[in-house]
């Protein structure tokens, strides 16, 4: 594909992410094309259909977040972590898109969030191999828990924010309010001992044995 085509492809995708995030998935291809500075025919040329365009947006958003998370978890350099935090407002279009996906539901939304869970399992494993993340008894379940609570928690925070339509401000405030408490829980733990965990684990294992 010619470089000009690649540039148009990326420009359309970026405009679509912004338009979907701002107006919802009911926005038309003509509006997306206008925002990208191209014709609706060129959108179809690159993506085939509106569903194809949304799928491309899903893939891009999921990969951008996976890449960012992996870089943070594999690094021992505070400069990397603080640099990402300084740029958190730049993630506003991606987060607006994810919020719309959570709110819209449907098969495409389920597919996107399944991909997010898959990616979480992948970057957590990268952290384990890098020695920055503790191994898990059940890596898949841990990834699912973190992806769902992370996405749902941000959605709830956004609903409680004084200006929920301003994603840049919401992300800035979210980082201020939530990063240190979450890091404390992840790093120091919450419960004073393993008694509750061991009790529920034994119960789960006993149930699995009965099923087997």
Swiss-Prot record:
Disulfide bonds: none
Summary of the function given for this chain in its UniProt record: Regulates the expression of the Rv1217c-Rv1218c multidrug efflux system and its own expression. Acts by binding to promoter regions of Rv1219c and upstream of the Rv1218c gene. Important for survival in prolonged stationary phase and during macrophage infection. May be used to eliminate non-growing mycobacteria.
KW Ribosomal protein (keyword) present: no
Gene designation: raaS
Lineage: superkingdom: Bacteria
InterPro entries recorded: Homeodomain-like_sf (IPR009057), HTH-type_TetR-like_transc_reg (IPR050109), HTH_TetR (IPR001647), Tet_transcr_reg_TetR-rel_C_sf (IPR036271), TetR_C_25 (IPR041484)
Matches recorded under SUPFAM superfamilies: Homeodomain-like, Tetracyclin repressor-like, C-terminal domain
Subunit structure, interactors included: Homodimer. Interacts with long chain acyl-CoA derivatives. Interacts with several drugs such rhodamine 6G, ethidium and safranin O.
GO MF annotation terms: DNA-binding transcription factor activity; transcription cis-regulatory region binding
Result when mutating residue 174 to A: Reduces DNA binding affinity and ligand binding
Name of the protein this chain belongs to: HTH-type transcriptional regulatory protein RaaS
Keywords of this entry: DNA-binding, Repressor, Transcription, Transcription regulation
Stimuli inducing this protein: Expression is autoregulated.
Known DNA-binding region: 28-47
Annotated domain remarks: Contains an N-terminal DNA-binding domain and a C-terminal ligand-binding domain, which can accommodate a variety of structurally unrelated antimicrobial agents. The C-terminal domain is also involved in dimerization.
HTH tetR-type domain: residues covered: 6-65
Free-text disruption phenotype from the record: Knockout mutant is impaired in long-term survival at stationary phase and does not persist during macrophage infection.
């Amino acid at each position: 594909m010619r470089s000009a085509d690649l540039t148009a492809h990326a420009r359309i995708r970026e405009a679509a992410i912004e338009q979907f995030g701002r107006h919802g998935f009911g926005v038309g291809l003509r509006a997306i094309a206008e925002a990208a500075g191209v014709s609706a025919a060129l959108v179809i040329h690159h993506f085939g259909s509106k569903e194809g365009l949304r799928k491309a947006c899903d893939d891009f958003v999921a990969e951008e977040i996976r890449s960012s998370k992996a870089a943070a978890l594999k690094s021992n350099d505070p400069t990397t972590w603080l640099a990402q935090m300084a740029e958190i407002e730049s993630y506003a279009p991606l987060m607006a898109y994810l919020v719309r996906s959570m709110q819209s539901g449907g098969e495409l939304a389920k597919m996107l969030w399944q991909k997010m869970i898959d990616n979480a399992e992948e970057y957590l494993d990268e952290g384990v191999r890098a020695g920055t993340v503790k191994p898990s008894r059940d890596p898949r379940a841990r990834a699912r828990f973190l992806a769902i609570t992370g996405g749902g928690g941000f959605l709830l925070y956004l609903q409680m924010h004084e200006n929920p339509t301003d994603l840049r401000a919401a992300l800035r405030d979210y980082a201020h309010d939530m990063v240190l408490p979450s890091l404390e829980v992840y790093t120091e733990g919450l419960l004073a001992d393993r008694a509750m965990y061991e009790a529920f684990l034994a119960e789960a294992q006993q149930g699995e044995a009965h099923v087997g």
